[in-house]
């Protein structure tokens, strides 16, 4: 799966997990996540992580997650890409 496809899937995960609806369509790789999307609070981060694990078939360790991971859609996509390549 190439990065563009992963980005689209991560966007779908965010749309579904956070119930963003059509607002998710406007997200780009540079879109800020934490602090910008009101639905993405600390509890929602757990929901998104679980959804990412289920969608992409890997497990995320607590030590793998940082604020930088959720800084932008691109940083979250890069995280998923790295996990898939590991």
Task: Please place each PLM-identified region on the residue numbering.
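Phosphopantetheine-dependent thiolation modules in NRPS/PKS and related acyl-activating systems
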Residues: 1-40, 44-55, 59-86
């Amino acid at each position: 799966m190439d990065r563009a496809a992963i980005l689209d899937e991560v966007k779908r995960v965010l749309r579904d997990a956070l119930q963003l609806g059509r607002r998710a369509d406007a997200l780009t790789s540079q879109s800020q996540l934490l602090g910008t999307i009101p639905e993405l609070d600390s509890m929602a981060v757990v929901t998104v992580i679980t959804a990412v694990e289920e969608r992409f078939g890997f497990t995320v360790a607590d030590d793998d997650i940082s604020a930088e991971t959720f800084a932008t859609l691109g940083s979250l996509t890069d995280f998923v890409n790295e996990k898939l390549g590991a």
